[in-house]
Amino acid sequence: MAKEEAIEVEGTIIEPLPNAMFRVELDNGHKVLAHISGKMRMHFIKILPGDRVTVELSPYDLTRGRVTFRTKNTKKKK
């Protein structure tokens, strides 16, 4: 059996949870539970509430996902 392709969507971190888990609100309004990918954990990339992230969802369970990328904030600091 071939591995099914993951679905990539964007969303916003709502709240951090224990064990590197996060509640993420997707752009379409759905809320999913997501954990950090291994490379992000290895490189100590910090994720805070309000950050925009890319989440991979399995086609089998659309309520859980993996955070694969954190987009840079474009807000200017004064």
Curated annotation (Swiss-Prot):
It comes from Desulfotalea psychrophila (strain LSv54 / DSM 12343). HAMAP family: IF_1. The gene is infA. Signal peptide: none annotated. Keywords: Cytoplasm, Initiation factor, Protein biosynthesis, RNA-binding, rRNA-binding. Belongs to the IF-1 family. PROSITE patterns: S1_IF1_TYPE. One of the essential components for the initiation of protein synthesis. Stabilizes the binding of IF-2 and IF-3 on the 30S subunit to which N-formylmethionyl-tRNA(fMet) subsequently binds. Helps modulate mRNA selection, yielding the 30S pre-initiation complex (PIC). Upon addition of the 50S ribosomal subunit IF-1, IF-2 and IF-3 are released leaving the mature 70S translation initiation complex. This is Translation initiation factor IF-1. SUPFAM superfamilies: Nucleic acid-binding proteins. One of its GO terms (cellular component) is cytosol. The lineage of its organism: Bacteria, Pseudomonadati, Thermodesulfobacteriota, Desulfobulbia, Desulfobulbales. Residues 1-72 form the S1-like domain. InterPro entries: NA-bd_OB-fold, RNA-binding_domain_S1_IF1, S1_domain, TIF_IF1.
